[in-house]
Amino acid sequence: MNSLKKLLVGLEKRFKVSALVAPLLIMGEVLLEVLIPLIMARIIDVGISNHDVGYVVKYGLIMILAALASLGFGVFAGKYAAVASVGFARNIRHRLFNKIQDFSFGNVDKFSTSSLITRLTTDVTNTQNTFQMIIRMCIRSPFMFVSAIIMSFYINSKMALIFLAAIPLIAIPAAIIMKKAFPRFQEMMKNYDLLNGTVQENLIGIRAVKAFVREKDEIERFKIAANAVRTTQVKAEKLVILNMPIMQLVMYLSIIAILWFGGNFIIAGSMQVGELISFITYLTQILMSLMMISMIFVMLVISKASMNRIVEVLDEEVDIKSAEKSKAVSSVKDGSIK
C-alpha cells in the first residue's frame, strides 16, 4: 500500500473527485441490493400467504424501483471508477517518462531498456486495473459482506451463525495461497523483462541477423524467453485457481446447511418461507463478496510486483543532475570557449 500512496502523488483534482464519488455511488448500489431480498421476503410471507394482491403489487413496484435505482448507481459508479483509473495511469506514465528523460546511461543500464519499457506499459496497465478494482470492489465487497451479515442476523440470528463458520474456511486458504503466489508473480515479471529484451535486441539488430543468417538462433532465443514466462505464469496460476473451487465447496456446503436447518425451523414454525429464500440470497451475496475479495487479493499480488517496480524507477537517484539555476546561453561575445 505504501507503493500505491507514492503513485497517487500528483493525481489531478478531477480524477481525485471521480475516485471519491465512485465509492459513494457503490455504497448506494449495495444498500439497495441488500434491501431487495428483504422486500421479496415480505411479498412472499405477507402478500402471497394472505392472498393480498394490492400488497404484492405495491411492494413489487418498490422492488422494481430499488433494482432500477441500484442499476443506475452501478452504471455511474463504473463510469467514475474508469475515469479515475485512466487518469491515475496517465499520471504514472507522465511521471515515469519524465523521470526516465533525466536518466544517465548508467541509470538506464541499471534497469535495462527492456525493463523500462515493461514498466511503462505492462506494469502501468496492471496498476491501473488494480486501482479501478480497489475503487469499485474494495468498497463494494466488504460493504456488501457487512450489510448482508447484518440483514441475516436481523432475519434469524441462529441461522446467521452458519456464515461465521464458513468465513474462516474461505479466508485461511486464500491467505496461504496469496502468500505463496506473490514470489511467483515477481519472478514472472522479471521473465517479461527478459522477453522484451530479446525482442528488442532482435529488432535493433535485424540487419545483422539476416546478414549472418542467424534467424534460427534468434527464434530459439525467443522460444526460451517465452517459455520462461509461460512456466512461471503457470506456476503462479496453479496456486491462484485453487481459490475458486474452495469457495464454491464452502458455498454449497453452506447452502445445504441453511436448507437443512431452515427447513426444520419452518416445520417448527419459527421461520417463514420468504425469510428462508431471502436468507439464501444473503448467503449468495456474502460468499460472492468473499470471492470478490479473494480476486482483489490476487490482483493486488500481481500488481504489487508491478507497483514496486514502478516506484523503483521513480525513487532512483539520477547520476548526473543538471544545475537547478542554469540558464540557456543567449550570446557568446568573442566566440571563445572557457
Question: Over which residues does each language-model region extend?
Answer:
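Helix-loop-helix
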Residues: 51-56, 151-165, 235-309, 313-314
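Cytoplasmic juxtamembrane "membrane-exit" helices immediately C-terminal to transmembrane segments
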Residues: 76-87, 91, 95, 153-154, ...
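Hydrophobic alpha-helical transmembrane bundles that constitute the permease/transmembrane domains
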Residues: 23, 27-38, 64-75, 126-130, ...
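Primarily ABC-family ATPase nucleotide-binding module
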Residues: 314-338
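Membrane-integrated ABC transporters
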Residues: 1-33, 40, 48-64, 77-81, ...
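Transmembrane helices of ABC transporter permease
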Residues: 14, 18-31, 42, 72, ...
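An intracellular "coupling" helix at the cytosolic face of ABC transporter transmembrane type-1 domains
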Residues: 9, 13-16, 80, 102-106, ...
